[in-house]
């Protein structure tokens, strides 16, 4: 069996920084909570929980604790609320997400109507929207654009894990909605690279495994890209893999979301190796 692994795989730089900060604060404080799931991968959250990094529930309120802002960021009002209760706040927001928040606030302050191309209910988008005083417009579907009024000044930013191709399609449809339109490409370069690798894999393999959390936006987009071309399976746990998907002469593609740990790739390879001898290629 030939296995083609898209590189890079494992955590992106933003996820690495977020987890590193959480572990550092845990070592200093002995107890730490994250405001929502630190990253969108249940396996990773479970491992962090075992170490003592706990996820604070939506309706849970704590005082005088060490709290970490998740990688996707938070609305500023939420951060201010937890600060008011005497908590120490440590910001693990991905630097690229932070950049989008700053841009959104800048555009709002300079009288631009801010348009965010992204998923309405995604934590990152909710956080970005808060920096427009919730006056921005979120475009998730092309049908959302029909409702957009004409504005003298429009500023466009993107959820960092958006598909580049889909984002550009939406931008083209927005171009007649304003006189002055400023576009900031805030899609994460690492996300774009993985999307391109997914396209490349789809031309090589006859079955693909996308490894990562089912709640991960960037992982879902990798799945969509590959599934348009080849049989594709989104795998969150090893138990989900069915050996009947493979044959000895299969060409299997493996790609990971940005919050998928390296050791999960190794576990999947070990399982495949137990079925057939492997010939591994990096793509």
UniProtKB/Swiss-Prot annotation:
InterPro entries linked: LytB/IspH (IPR003451)
Binding residues annotated for [4Fe-4S] cluster, in chain numbering: 12, 94, 188
The protein, known as: 4-hydroxy-3-methylbut-2-enyl diphosphate reductase
Family of the protein in this entry: Belongs to the IspH family.
Record-listed isopentenyl diphosphate binding positions: 40, 72, 122, 216, 218, 259
Lineage of the species this protein comes from: Bacteria, Pseudomonadati, Dictyoglomota, Dictyoglomia, Dictyoglomales
Chain sites annotated for binding dimethylallyl diphosphate: 40, 72, 122, 216, 218, 259
Binding site for (2E)-4-hydroxy-3-methylbut-2-enyl diphosphate: 40, 72, 122, 160, 216, 218, 259
CC per GO annotation: cytosol
Source organism per UniProt: Dictyoglomus turgidum (strain DSM 6724 / Z-1310)
Annotated function: Catalyzes the conversion of 1-hydroxy-2-methyl-2-(E)-butenyl 4-diphosphate (HMBPP) into a mixture of isopentenyl diphosphate (IPP) and dimethylallyl diphosphate (DMAPP). Acts in the terminal step of the DOXP/MEP pathway for isoprenoid precursor biosynthesis.
Reactions the enzyme catalyzes: isopentenyl diphosphate + 2 oxidized [2Fe-2S]-[ferredoxin] + H2O = (2E)-4-hydroxy-3-methylbut-2-enyl diphosphate + 2 reduced [2Fe-2S]-[ferredoxin] + 2 H(+); dimethylallyl diphosphate + 2 oxidized [2Fe-2S]-[ferredoxin] + H2O = (2E)-4-hydroxy-3-methylbut-2-enyl diphosphate + 2 reduced [2Fe-2S]-[ferredoxin] + 2 H(+)
One GO BP: dimethylallyl diphosphate biosynthetic process
EC number: 1.17.7.4
Entry's cofactor comment: Binds 1 [4Fe-4S] cluster per subunit.
Gene: ispH
Active site (catalytic residues): 124 (proton donor)
Cofactor needs: [4Fe-4S] cluster
An example molecular function term from Gene Ontology annotations: 4 iron, 4 sulfur cluster binding
Recorded superkingdom: Bacteria
Sorted UniProt keywords: 4Fe-4S, Iron, Iron-sulfur, Isoprene biosynthesis, Metal-binding, Oxidoreductase
Pathway: Isoprenoid biosynthesis; dimethylallyl diphosphate biosynthesis; dimethylallyl diphosphate from (2E)-4-hydroxy-3-methylbutenyl diphosphate: step 1/1; Isoprenoid biosynthesis; isopentenyl diphosphate biosynthesis via DXP pathway; isopentenyl diphosphate from 1-deoxy-D-xylulose 5-phosphate: step 6/6
């Amino acid at each position: 069996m030939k296995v083609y692994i898209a590189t890079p795989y494992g955590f992106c730089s933003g996820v690495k920084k977020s987890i590193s900060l959480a572990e550092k604060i845990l070592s200093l404080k002995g107890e730490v909570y994250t405001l929502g799931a630190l990253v969108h991968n249940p396996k990773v959250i479970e491992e962090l929980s075992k170490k003592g990094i706990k996820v604070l529930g939506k309706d849970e309120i704590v005082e005088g604790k060490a709290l970490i802002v998740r990688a996707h960021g938070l609305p500023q009002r939420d951060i201010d609320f937890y600060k008011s209760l005497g908590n120490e706040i440590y910001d693990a927001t991905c630097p690229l997400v932070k950049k989008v928040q700053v841009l959104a606030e800048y555009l709002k302050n300079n009288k631009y109507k801010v348009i965010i191309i992204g998923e309405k209910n995604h934590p990152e988008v909710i956080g970005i929207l808060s920096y427009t005083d919730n006056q921005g417009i979120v475009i998730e579907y092309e049908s959302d654009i029909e409702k957009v009024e004409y504005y003298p000044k429009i500023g466009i930013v993107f959820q960092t894990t958006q598909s580049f191709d889909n984002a550009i399609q939406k931008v083209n449809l927005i171009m007649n909605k304003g006189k002055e339109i400023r576009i900031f490409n805030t899609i994460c370069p690492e996300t774009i690279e993985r999307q391109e690798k997914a396209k490349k894999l789809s031309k090589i393999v006859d079955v693909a495994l996308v490894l990562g959390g089912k709640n991960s936006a960037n992982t879902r987009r990798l799945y969509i890209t590959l599934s348009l071309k080849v049989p594709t399976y989104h795998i969150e746990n090893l138990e989900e893999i069915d050996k009947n998907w493979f044959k000895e002469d299969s060409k299997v593609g493996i790609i990971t979301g940005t919050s998928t740990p390296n050791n999960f790739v190794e576990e999947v390879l070990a399982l495949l190796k137990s079925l057939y001898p492997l010939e591994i290629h990096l793509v």
